[in-house]
């Protein structure tokens, strides 16, 4: 029973799917995809549940969401293990993901009141009231890198706003999706308010093509995001929130403390085995002896990183990638860049064939032509050297993406220049690119997406503003507009 539709657990009628741990190959989940008819059934259930859910007092919706938060806290260890075993990330990092899920709920509730909710302005002859209304039935597409935390950033604000949902987790993380939905069930969500459909491309296409959807909230790759954008083009009545990837630059301009700069770079490029959309993909290092020393130290320390199993003791900094195929894709990208003329500074290495354990790779591409402007979702860092800061900004902006950008420098003026000229939604100074706060907007421009799917700013796209001019009485104005004559004529 792997689908949850209209409050019932049912068996999918689509393709059989099996999920294994990406490092041990242990089978950890089995089930069937939802077919097109079941996807449509989930949408019908969400549509039927919408009027009653939307009319619930906000306090009632909030109470269920807060019960979910309490269940997350009570089952934190269990969910941590599920996420770690399914994604391959270390236990310590999976635990931080569950903590982020819990913390985001209180922020989402506060954001609803601050950014949406209801506001009234008194007028001479009545009032002007701003209210927010839910869109209706929304589809939520989840990614695999943070299979609990990132969908949660759509689901919680959308439910608080009064929407009903169909959630499709990544086909690479079905177990996490199912585990989280079971907690929502225990929290007391009414039937049909949140529905779970498992599956891959066919299930996703069936979901995104439903005429009765009022919108789609997506976190994932740029290629899939572009497909969804094309599919929903010409349908302005549907809200489409896209959070996609990045080909993110980190500029190393002025290094006062080389080890601190190396630590920041490791956190930016290789945490989560390079599987964060904000990870640094392009390292821009100033030419000269200081830059040379920084790169030598980076290669030295990065070369000591040994990925390990989720439950290793002591815990590793990074675990496996989401699949052995993902690790192979990173290896192929590295070889492609070598073939273009890149100079390998640190060769990535498969720790064990057939697993997703992969050591970091670093390759210099200064002066190399035709380097693909793509997001390689893994621990591969591309290096360019530059002569002056204006050139660094030009290199940083030489991408169709625009998610995150960072600067290591002691010069505040350079950061202020970067703030003005960088084409990115996140611009950091002496901070890792991969840090994020739920109280701040998260997202970018260009191929990185449109809206800002964090707990605070997600409220903006989960409801639409409605303005009302209101008066309890209807009276004739004392002063009429020119040309209007309401004088009463005497009867003949």
From Swiss-Prot:
Pfam families: Aldedh. InterPro entries: Ald_DH/histidinol_DH, Ald_DH_C, Ald_DH_CS_CYS, Ald_DH_CS_GLU, Ald_DH_N, Aldehyde_DH_dom, SuccinylGlu_semiald_DH_AstD. Coiled coil: none annotated. Pathway: Amino-acid degradation; L-arginine degradation via AST pathway; L-glutamate and succinate from L-arginine: step 4/5. Its EC number is 1.2.1.71. One of its GO terms (molecular function) is succinylglutamate-semialdehyde dehydrogenase activity. NAD(+) binds at residues 220-225. The keyword Magnesium does not apply. The active site is at residues 243, 277. One of its GO terms (biological process) is arginine catabolic process to succinate. It catalyses: N-succinyl-L-glutamate 5-semialdehyde + NAD(+) + H2O = N-succinyl-L-glutamate + NADH + 2 H(+). Keywords: Arginine metabolism, NAD, Oxidoreductase. Disulfide bonds: none annotated. Catalyzes the NAD-dependent reduction of succinylglutamate semialdehyde into succinylglutamate. Belongs to the aldehyde dehydrogenase family. AstD subfamily. NCBIfam families: arg_catab_astD (TIGR03240), PRK09457.1 (NF006992). HAMAP family: Aldedh_AstD. This is N-succinylglutamate 5-semialdehyde dehydrogenase. It comes from Salmonella dublin (strain CT_02021853).
């Amino acid at each position: 029973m792997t689908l949850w539709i209209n409050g019932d657990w049912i068996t999918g009628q689509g393709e059989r799917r099996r999920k294994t741990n990406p490092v041990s190959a242990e089978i950890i989940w089995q089930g069937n995809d939802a077919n097109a008819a079941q996807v449509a059934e989930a949408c019908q259930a969400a549509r039927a549940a919408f009027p009653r859910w939307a009319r619930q007092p906000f306090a009632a919706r909030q109470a269920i969401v807060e019960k979910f938060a309490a269940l997350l806290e009570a089952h934190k260890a269990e969910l941590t293990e599920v996420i770690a075993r399914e994604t391959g990330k270390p236990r310590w990092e999976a635990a931080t993901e569950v903590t982020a899920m819990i913390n985001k709920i209180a922020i989402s509730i506060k954001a609803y009141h601050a950014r949406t909710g209801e506001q009234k302005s008194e007028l001479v002859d009545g009032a002007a009231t701003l209210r927010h209304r839910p869109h209706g039935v929304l589809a939520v597409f989840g990614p695999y890198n943070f299979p609990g935390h990132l969908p949660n950033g759509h689901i919680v604000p959308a439910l608080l706003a009064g929407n009903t949902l169909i959630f499709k987790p990544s086909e690479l993380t079905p177990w996490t999706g199912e585990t989280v939905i079971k907690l929502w069930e225990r929290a007391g969500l009414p039937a049909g308010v949140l529905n779970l459909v498992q599956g891959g491309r066919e299930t996703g296409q069936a979901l995104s093509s439903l005429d009765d959807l009022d919108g789609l909230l997506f976190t994932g790759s740029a290629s899939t995001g572009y497909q969804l954008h094309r599919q929903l083009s010409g349908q302005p009545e549907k809200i489409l929130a896209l959070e996609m990837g990045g080909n993110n630059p980190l500029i190393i301009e002025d290094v006062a403390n080389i080890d601190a700069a190396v630590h920041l770079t490791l956190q930016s490029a290789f945490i989560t085995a390079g599987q964060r959309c904000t990870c640094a993909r392009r390292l821009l290092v100033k030419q000269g002896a200081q830059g040379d020393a920084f790169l030598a130290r980076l290669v030295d320390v990065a070369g000591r990183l040994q990925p390990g199993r989720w439950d290793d003791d002591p815990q590793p900094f990074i675990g496996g990638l989401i699949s052995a195929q993902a690790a192979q894709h990173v290896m192929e990208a590295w070889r492609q860049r070598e073939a273009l003329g890149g100079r390998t500074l640190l060769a990535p290495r498969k720790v064990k064939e057939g697993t997703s354990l992969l050591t970091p790779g670093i390759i210099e591409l200064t002066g190399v032509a035709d380097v693909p402007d793509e997001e390689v979702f893994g621990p591969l860092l591309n290096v360019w050297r530059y002569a002056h800061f204006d050139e660094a900004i030009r290199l940083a902006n030489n991408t169709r993406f625009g998610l995150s950008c960072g600067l290591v420098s002691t010069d505040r003026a350079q950061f202020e220049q970067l703030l003005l000229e960088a084409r990115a939604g996140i611009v950091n100074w002496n901070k890792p690119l991969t840090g994020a706060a739920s109280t701040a907007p998260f997202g970018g421009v260009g191929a990185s997406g449109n809206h800002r799917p964090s707990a605070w700013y997600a409220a903006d796209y989960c409801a639409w503003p409605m303005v009302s001019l209101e008066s309890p009485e209807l009276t004739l104005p004392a002063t009429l507009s020119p040309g209007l004559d309401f004088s009463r004529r005497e009867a003949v």
